[in-house]
Amino acid sequence: MSAVRRQVRKRRGGVVAVRDQDKPLFVSVDELVSYVTDGDRIGVGGALLTRLPLSALHALAARRPKELQYISWGGGIPLEILLGADCVAKIVFCFSSLDIFGLAPLFRRALEEGTVQYEEWPAFAFTAALEASKQNLPSMPFRVPRGSDLLTNRSDIARSPDSSVEVEIGLAPRRDLDVFVMHAQRVDEAGNVEICGARGMDTLAVFCAHTVLVTAEEVVPVGELGHLRDSFVIPRDVVDHIAIEPYGAYPTSCLPHYIADFACLADVTSVSPPPVPPRPTGAASERIREAPTLTHQRIRETVAEVVAARAANDAPPTIDEIMVCWLAQRISNESICSAGAVSPLAVTSYLLAKATHAPHVSIMMTSGGLVDIALRPMLLALGEALDTKSAPVQCGGEDTYRWYYQQGRVTCEVVASAQIDRHARTNNIEVTSPKGRRVRLPGQGGMADVADLHRDFVLYQTRQSTLSLVESVDRVSASRAVKSASERETAGLVPGEIVLVTNLGCYEYDMASDELVLASVHPGVSVEEVRAATGFELRVSDHLVVTPLPSPATLRVLRDEVDPLGLRRLEFVSAQERTTLLAECIEAEEDLIARALHWV
């Protein structure tokens, strides 16, 4: 199938080029990726475990183009596939992990061994660089995250004369893409492309690329697109080639066609690089395709049935439950809470608050793409499906950055950090092991920006030790630079707090001494135990208390309604234990889906 194409003038390396009208619009996946050439600057669509163009990337890896520059907010599975085929010479990114499945091994090895070049960007600077390309400008202003050292020695990023003492403005140079590869739910016969649900950075990056390559679940007649709630239609004028590829995002999700297959994801992420997964068939195919039809009410009913069939849990609260409940108590009806990547503990605390004392809290999920979700249980693949049904606002990550983050509207984004020092500076970039080895971490994502912008800077560690709570971090990925109420008001920010909760106790930040102070110890924990697990001289509050235990009623809601699978526990166990626990949670969710669909 082909179509008569309209001439469109697009940029490549500063030179205006004319698209070749004679090349076919609809092609095979193998032909689609043949348009990627050695040295291309390539961007990848989707977000986290949502709508990743994995079929196209596996086909691209099989061709083994060389010297690619991978330019994307996130790395994850797409970057692992391309690194495994030795395609990548440079990475421009904000964050890279395998989400709930752990660290990204090839990304870590490449940066630790120096086999690829890389640029690590704060999220706002990265989106500003893409926005400059989208608007055909040389640069775009952004608020410099003053509490991070990410931009230290970055001569390519100038400072604006509009900077002030309170607000430093940087100028991000434009970032053009030679190729953008994405997966979509539907396209029409003319080449218009429709995406639904959380958009990642797709609606920004697609307008920065010289060549746009799309795989899609299905093709429909002209006039069919744009009628689904919160869908976004990319005009055919910016789309170059399309391959119709059912399951083109599998085993990640492509709603409403199918949810993510977490069992398959566990298999492919356990191998490096991730292999091509077998196409789902039989019951597995039916499960992921039928699950998006399930309603909140049906899931609540099924959870209640499952809970009623198991033994009552009257055990005392565990440390994960104490931490979740403490975090939830910080949330009110007026709160706006954003969920970062790989944060089961944080999301559980938001949902617990919504289920108990703060029913009107607004929660943003899936990289900010799903805003103000309805209450639902803490789940894996089903969580995104339910959130997509309920979120009244579905947008791109850059949209929530502008609408919420830069406006200072977000109350908190509860975030974990591998290293935190006495001054509440965090490090998710890299650490040095006790043996002196450089250990690469996933990166800060957007922490560098939100440390100042959100009202509260809320941190957590689930396994406090002298290696994680240190005198001084090896790198400062994020910290709050604008601290006092007067400074924050002058900078147009909401005054707030800096707090840390660990598996041993809770800390508050004392501005006068610029340090974290132990404010409470968890039940059964002594100050001496905390001191022994702290890498700096511990200061204890004169008003030290014991962290309150959650009430029996709150515990029941947490265990039976909010987190019946126990996903909050995933952040409290070793890597080996995590694999086993995650497998149990995946199996439990698959059973839940089967019951909800009346299969058992």
Name each model-derived stretch.
Residues 25-29, 49, 313-324:
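Cofactor-pocket helix-loop regions in the catalytic cores of large enzyme subunits
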Residues 42-44, 49-64, 322-369:
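N-terminal low-complexity or amphipathic/hydrophobic leaders
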Residues 46, 223, 319-322, 334-340, ...:
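Flexible, glycine/charged-enriched surface loops at secondary-structure junctions
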Residues 4-33, 48-62, 78, 87-90, ...:
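Conserved phosphate- and dinucleotide-binding cores of soluble alpha/beta proteins
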Residues 67-69, 334-337, 514-517:
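Short active-site oxyanion
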Residues 254, 283, 542-596:
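A conserved C-terminal secondary-structure "cap"
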Residues 79, 366-377:
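Short connector loops at secondary-structure junctions
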